């Protein structure tokens, strides 16, 4: 490590010293002590200003400073001569052979003496380390005369080695590995406090103290300790995470499997259940009677609005079947009317048109539903004296909510002499109608909340409390088949047609599997025996078919559904196609 002092342009004084780490390692190697990690040298010392002094005074001051530290006497015998001559090579040759350990006892003695001697006035400016920027003023009571002259002339630039001071610091205070990565931090030891108190007498006290405070903030990294609230919050979060995984790690199913099907009591038939429910006394009977009387007062108003070209739809909580029945018995005794129970599982738009043509005394059949609708329209246009009232319970039922069914019923209601009054119960029933259908129906909406039980409307639905007959209604059949693929529906349609063709055959036990496979293969519905068996398994799971073996061991297929329902299903399929 090299420190350079410029005295003049023609005279150059250079002093070369060995670094702190090399001196310390040399001493500890001799004494067998532990080695300390190398640190960066802190040598460059600056004062605020440089004032030119006479040449003789500069030389004397420099020599006194060097003699005070006793560096020249220890580090090399011929260094003073090289300094006088201004030679840099001679001094370096005498310094670097120091590593040959020519004077080990003398170096150990020097180290112990320097550890006891008071420190000199030094200003550190650690420019070599980018992490540390700090200036620390230090002084001692035991200054020599040369040191006092140096303090008076603070504008002068000095290049002094801090090896003795750094060595003493390492011997007194061992280096601790703090969380901060800086290699130097401001110390709060007694020595530094004494130095700071003595330096307060200096004229630059305020400026230097501000620098120290600013640089201390840069050097010492703040240690943020966790507050109790943050610690509790972190522990609470960790507990929540642990509880989440504990709750989801269990493979045990907590859902109960106790259903009504596992009850040991025998299931009731429909008549027994109806008798038991009829014995239950209704609550709020007086209020319900008064509410129904308010609705009955609207009957004449409804009749007037129907003749004015409007159709009436009733909505609200509770069954409206009894209300429409009272309207029929009160106002339509002398009129032609048709009551359609939309909640019936076997109802379809075809059956609605058949009822209308039956009232009009038509004999014959129609090729399609559209032909039948066209005939009804022409009949009412030809005879203006014809009047027909249609009462439809549950117009939004599963069998009538289709787009084609609503379109046909809307065209019927748009005729001049057909009057429609219907009820809806589903919350989203108005979504069935777009603007075109709304214009056909020409509705007037009436809220008729009755709070009555849906006894008749739900009587055809499957219940866990009632024994099942085993027959599949048309609504369930359509619902199941709509969830299947087109090929699956085609396979089932072939089986229906074959069964309807043989309905008059008393010895018919079903369709042979091999014959059925051949028909499906010819219709390009299946390509292998396994494909057909997989599809039949799905039908069997939905209870659409039943298989049995004959006396010859051949497998036969049969649909356990009434032939009338199968006929309605085929008609419904043809209408949709």
From Swiss-Prot:
Residues 189-204 have a biased composition (Acidic residues). Residues 83-103, 133-204 are annotated as: Disordered. Its main location: nucleus. Keywords: DNA replication, Nucleus, Phosphoprotein. It comes from the Eukaryota. It is found in: Nucleus. Residues 144-158 have a biased composition (Basic and acidic residues). One of its GO terms (biological process) is DNA replication. GO terms for cellular component: nuclear origin of replication recognition complex. The modification Phosphoserine is found at residues 249, 281. Involved in LRWD1-binding repeats lie at residues 1-100. Pfam families: RecA-like_ORC2, WHD_ORC2. GO terms for molecular function: DNA replication origin binding. The modification Phosphothreonine is found at residues 117, 227. Component of the origin recognition complex (ORC) that binds origins of replication. DNA-binding is ATP-dependent. The specific DNA sequences that define origins of replication have not been identified yet. ORC is required to assemble the pre-replication complex necessary to initiate DNA replication. Binds histone H3 and H4 trimethylation marks H3K9me3, H3K20me3 and H4K27me3. Stabilizes LRWD1, by protecting it from ubiquitin-mediated proteasomal degradation. Also stabilizes ORC3. Component of ORC, a complex composed of at least 6 subunits: ORC1, ORC2, ORC3, ORC4, ORC5 and ORC6. ORC is regulated in a cell-cycle dependent manner. It is sequentially assembled at the exit from anaphase of mitosis and disassembled as cells enter S phase. Interacts with DBF4. Interacts with MCM10. Interacts with LRWD1 throughout the cell cycle; this interaction, which occurs only with non-ubiquitinated form of LRWD1, prevents LRWD1 ubiquitination and hence stabilizes the protein. Interacts with POLQ. Belongs to the ORC2 family. This is Origin recognition complex subunit 2.
């Amino acid at each position: 490590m090299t420190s350079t002092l410029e005295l003049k342009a023609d005279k150059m004084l250079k002093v070369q010293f060995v670094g702190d780490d090399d001196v310390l390692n040399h001493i500890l190697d001799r004494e067998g002590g532990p080695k300390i990690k190398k640190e960066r040298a802190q040598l460059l010392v600056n004062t605020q200003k440089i004032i030119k002094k006479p040449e003789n005074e500069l030389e004397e001051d420099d020599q006194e400073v060097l003699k005070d530290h006793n560096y020249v006497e220890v580090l090399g015998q011929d260094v003073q001569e090289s300094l006088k001559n201004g030679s840099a090579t001679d001094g370096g040759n005498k310094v670097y052979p120091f590593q040959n350990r020519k004077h080990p006892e003398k170096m150990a003695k020097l180290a112990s003496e320097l550890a006891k001697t008071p420190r000199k006035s030094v200003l550190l400016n650690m420019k070599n380390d980018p992490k540390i920027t700090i200036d620390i003023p230090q002084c001692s009571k035991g200054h020599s005369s040369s040191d006092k002259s140096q303090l008076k002339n603070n504008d002068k630039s000095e290049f002094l080695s801090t090896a003795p001071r750094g060595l003493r610091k390492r011997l007194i205070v061992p280096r601790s590995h703090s969380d901060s990565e800086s290699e130097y931090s401001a110390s709060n030891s007694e020595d530094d406090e004494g130095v700071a108190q003595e330096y307060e007498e200096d004229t630059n006290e305020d400026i230097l103290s501000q620098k120290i405070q600013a640089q201390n903030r840069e050097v010492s990294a703040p240690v943020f300790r966790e507050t109790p609230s943050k610690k509790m919050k972190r522990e609470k979060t960790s507990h929540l995470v642990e509880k989440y995984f504990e709750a989801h790690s269990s493979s045990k199913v907590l859902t109960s499997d106790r259903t009504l099907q596992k009850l040991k009591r025998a299931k009731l038939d429909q008549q027994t259940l109806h008798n038991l429910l009829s014995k239950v006394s209704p609550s709020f009977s007086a209020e319900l009677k008064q509410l129904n009387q308010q609705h009955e007062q609207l009957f004449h108003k409804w009749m007037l609005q129907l003749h004015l070209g409007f159709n009436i739809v009733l909505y609200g909580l509770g069954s409206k079947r009894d209300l429409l029945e009272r309207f029929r018995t009160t106002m339509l005794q002398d009129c032609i009317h048709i009551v359609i129970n939309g909640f019936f599982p076997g109802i379809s738009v075809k059956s609605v048109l058949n009822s209308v043509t039956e009232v009009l005394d038509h004999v014959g059949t129609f090729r399609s539903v559209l032909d039948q609708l066209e005939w009804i329209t022409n009949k009412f246009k030809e005879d203006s004296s014809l009047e027909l009232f249609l009462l439809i319970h549950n117009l939004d039922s599963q069998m009538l909510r289709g787009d084609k069914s609503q379109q046909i019923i809307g065209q019927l209601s748009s005729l001049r002499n057909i009057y429609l009054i219907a009820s809806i119960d589903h919350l989203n029933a108005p979504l069935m109608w777009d603007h075109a259908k709304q214009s056909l129906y020409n509705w007037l909406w009436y809220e008729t909340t009755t709070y009555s039980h849906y006894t008749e409307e739900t009587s055809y639905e499957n219940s866990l409390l009632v024994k099942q007959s085993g027959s599949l209604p048309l609504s369930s059949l359509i619902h199941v088949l709509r969830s299947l693929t087109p090929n699956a529906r085609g396979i089932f349609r072939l089986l229906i047609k074959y069964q309807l063709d043989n309905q008059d055959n008393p010895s018919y036990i079903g369709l042979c599997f091999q014959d059925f496979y051949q028909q499906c293969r010819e219709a390009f519905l299946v390509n292998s025996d396994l494909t057909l068996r997989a599809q039949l398994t799905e039908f069997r799971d939905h209870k659409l078919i039943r298989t049995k073996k004959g006396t010859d061991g051949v497998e036969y297929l049969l649909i356990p559904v009434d032939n009338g329902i199968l006929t309605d299903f085929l008609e419904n399929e043809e209408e949709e196609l």
